Each structure stands twice: as structure tokens, then as C-alpha cells.
Amino acid sequence: MKLSFTKMHGAGNDFVVLDGYSRALPPLTDALVRALADRHFGIGADQLLLVEKPTVDGADFKYRIFNCDGGEVEHCGNGARCFVKFVRDHGLTDKASVRVEVKHGVITLTMQDNGEVVVDMGAPVFEPARVPFDTSGLDGRREGADTLWPLPVNGATRWISVVSMGNPHAVQIVDDAEAFPVLADGPAIERDPRFPQRVNAGFMQIVSRHEVKLRVYERGAGETLACGTGACAAVAAGIRRGQLDSPVTVHTHGGTLTISWDGARDERAPLMMAGPATTVFEGVIDLPA
């Protein structure tokens, strides 16, 4: 069987995008997702994105995300920007703004005249039980409006903020993001048993009150060149701690994102993320019988 696909990226976070809206697709088993995402024997991607017909009122499309390990996850901000470019470029809609069903609700994606996409990422959640994060036996430390939690990692204690952007994040502020042992600490934090659904680990260096550098070790994908939900979680944590002011420019290895949040006034306000979405190539792959 032949499978048509589009390869895209958002700030270097790369995706295989499949159209399940206008055509029938084979079942997306864990094995098939892993095969497509394999960088040596497949197409290669951090995640696979699936466009489907919505199942809830008020949505134009349904957006599903699969990590390169085959597991389906709740949200991906960089993928959301690629999603709206895909559906417009492939004639599935001519709307500048589309409403998209994801696991935790419906989000709005808007294509701007300059080619960048603005994503309404929704409001962050800080309650540990809803991230989820198990705080039993831990003594938190207040910093601004936030609570930091101690986590033993490779013989050291790391103080983290926990945030949900529809998916779980652990954010810590570091002195030097480039020098920090992300590839050692990231896997340990990702699989810490206090995170029953595992977690995305963010490492943020504050450059100024409106600028940060960020690396993210993503759950099920490892360190990626950019992580949209990770950028939102990091900025929300920094504003809540009193160390950042909106808007914030987030520098990742793959590019730059702009995050805006009026959370200092109202924590129920949505985070808005602006950034690029790029089509790399279109292709067809032969699937094993």
C-alpha cells in the first residue's frame, strides 16, 4: 500500500502529516507510527500529525498527535501551527482561523498575512493533581505566585514548576541552558514516578524579562529543536514566579517563538503563541504488506 504524506516543521520541530479528513488511512498502530518516524528506515519525524473530521460541535477539524515512540499525546503547539498551514494548503479550508478539536478541548489557530501562525493555546493549569504530579511528602517553596517542588535528579535536587498545557510539563530555571546536562537530567525527570503520565522537561535560561533560551526534553521523543507547549509552560512559570513579563521571545535550537500571556492579571487568560510553519516536501511511501 502507498501512503501519501507531507513533511513539515515548526521551528525545527519536525512532523509527518497525514490527511485522514478526505481519504481513508490504514490503522495507525504503534509499530506503523514508529516506522514512519524512523530517521534511518522511514521518513523521520519527532511526531506524526493526523487530520481528521471533528467529533464535537463547533470544531472544523480534529487534530491528533503521535510521538515517535508510537504513543498518542494530548497536544503539540508547533504541530498546531503546521496543522493549519496543511489544511489551508491542501484545500481543506479557506478560513484564516480554524477551530480544532484536541484531546483537552477546542483550540483556535490563525494564519497571519506574514505566514506566521498564532495559536490560542488555552489557559495553563498549575494545580499539581491536574498536571498530574504527586506532591505527597514534599515541601514546596513559594516564589512569587508559584510553588516550586524539589525533585531528586541524578544526585542533585532540582526545583521545578509543574504546569499543564493539556500535556504535563516540569520547568526549571537554569543559569546556562547550553551547558546544562539536559540529556542526562531530561530522561530522569521525564520518567520520575511522581509524574504518572511521564512529563516534558523544560530547562529555561532567563536573558531578560522579555527574552529566554529554552531546551525541552519531550516525553516519548527526547530533546527536540523546539517545543511549543514547552515554551508556553516555561513562560507561564516565569511570569508566575515574577521573573518574566509578557510578551516573551523564546529562543530554541530550531528557531524563535513569541509567547504572550496576561496571567499576571488573570491566570485564566489563554497563552498565545506565534511562530513559523514550514512545508519541507510532499511524498509517498510504500508500506509493508
Swiss-Prot record:
Biological process terms in GO annotation: lysine biosynthetic process via diaminopimelate
Recorded GO MF terms: diaminopimelate epimerase activity
Role description: Catalyzes the stereoinversion of LL-2,6-diaminopimelate (L,L-DAP) to meso-diaminopimelate (meso-DAP), a precursor of L-lysine and an essential component of the bacterial peptidoglycan.
Active site positions, chain numbering: 76 (proton donor), 227 (proton acceptor)
Catalytic activity: (2S,6S)-2,6-diaminopimelate = meso-2,6-diaminopimelate
Source taxonomy: Bacteria, Pseudomonadati, Pseudomonadota, Betaproteobacteria, Burkholderiales
Record flagged with keyword Isomerase: yes
Site (Could be important to modulate the pK values of the two catalytic cysteine residues): 169, 218
Name under which the protein is recorded: Diaminopimelate epimerase
NCBIfam families according to UniProt: DapF
Binding site for substrate: 13, 47, 67, 77-78, 167, 200, 218-219, 228-229
Subunit details: Homodimer.
Family: Belongs to the diaminopimelate epimerase family.
GO cellular component: cytosol
